[in-house]
Amino acid sequence: MNRKRKSRRAGSILCQRLGRAAVVLLALLLAQAGYAHASVALLMEEPYGDFGAMNPTGHSAIYLNHICAASPTELRPCQPGESGVVISRYHKVGGLDWVAIPLIPYLYAVEDVTQVPQSVDKAQVAALSDAYRRKHLLELAPNGSDGRTPKGEWTELVGESYLRTIHGFEVVSTAEQDERFIALFNDRKNTGHFNILVHNCADFSRVVMDIYLPNAIHRSVVADLGITTPKQVARSLVQYGRKHPEVEMSAFVIPQVPGTIKRSKPVDGVAQSLVKSKKYLIPMTILTPELTGGLVVAYMAEGRMKLPKNAMVFNVNDNEMEPGAPWPVQAANTDPNRSLLPAPAAATATAPTASPVVTTVNTPAALATSAPEPPSTLP
């Protein structure tokens, strides 16, 4: 019994130290955001909750590190020291097609990384999200009767890392591309017409990435029955990165914050979700065996993509990065302002206590550290 207690205590201390080191790395990254290279990143977010169990395709968003939000519906260039914005399409949020939220609030529903709790429960997440809403999002989600917190899907705008693990795929961008993106989105009509089949969050990510990398993202008629999914957008981007090393693709993972909230699940495509689920597969096999066989072939042919359950940093070849292993060779870093992050082992445990925040790799010189392993959405 004493051995078990000591083991648990040691594990808890290790998680705390890893969390502090991660905060140091994130602080270094954000401090240099105004000087480092511009980039655009696809965020492929794991499914969670009841809807995620029914539809395990997850959610997708776009992170732009040199573009910031003048408001949730207006974009501007970032000032030195600002960390960029996450933009995505939502269903029934203020009647809008897209909403832009600063990175740290999007992930943690706070305005500074030092405020991120080390672990959370549902009540804490609700309190943090509502506090941010009352300060910044009343126009999109006004108070209910008697000043109460309103129901609705506004909760998807902040605190995402409390609910799920997020996988990121980053490519470099230029100031001219960012300026064009800002002009296009500030001028276009921002009216929601969400449709899960033809106009969903992954379709939005595809449109955004097409501005930066024309024709890089495409639907998969075979693996996803023509529906754009977060996993297909990621797969297309990875394939593009293989063929075009000049985009300097890198990958990162933002782990789900520890706590009592149920862990998110791996992202699936359409065919994959049907093939893997017994509640769909067995009835389909009985009723339409030919169709079921076709789905299995589709999944095996185009639906697979290596995303290890213990969520390491992985590269453009979908290879899992083991802790301490050298980063596989890819294009050399040609940007003298592109700062290298130190290896996590070199970080000092002096940052404020917080949860594991982000593990990121930008170049072959940096090493990856593993994220906490989850026990085994498009919300």
Residue ranges and their predicted role:
Residues 42-49:
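N-terminal post-signal-peptidase region of extra-cytosolic proteins
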Residues 36, 54-56:
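Extracellular/periplasmic catalytic domains that process cell-envelope and extracellular macromolecules
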Residues 40, 58-62:
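Residue-level detector of short, conserved catalytic/binding motifs and their immediate flanks
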